[in-house]
Amino acid sequence: MPVSFENNWKNILDKLRNLFRTEFAGTLPVYIGTAPDAGTQYVQLTPTGSELLEYNVTSESREFTINVVYYFAEHNVKKTGLDHVLRYVSRIEALIHDNMAVTLTDSSNLYNCRMETMELLPDDEAGVYVVQWEYKCQHTGNIS
């Protein structure tokens, strides 16, 4: 007999992408997986793993981890370019903070959603800034 399941990864990634698209209203492309050569700025979401937190007969709780990358390229990056990057960093972090709990398309909930670490990787010669976050969220699924 086949198992019934929800594609939690797809639901979580779609919700996260929709949060970004709603907030930035088309000004910041968002890609899941490999980002094509997408221009001067974009966000890339890459699933990296999950950890089982609680397992019992009626459900399981997992913590999902997603690598979030903000890419910004500007030739001859000056102070204004860095200001732009830091404004986006702060706005993205505020967006995630304001959505610590969200409902997925299957009506299940994500909770304890947060950005745990952030790393700013400037490449002054290439005029590129890459900002990486480790996004984590918890989900209870396989409820019977």
Question: Where do the PLM segments sit?
Answer:
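A short, hydrophobic beta-strand-centered structural micro-motif
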Residues: T40-T48
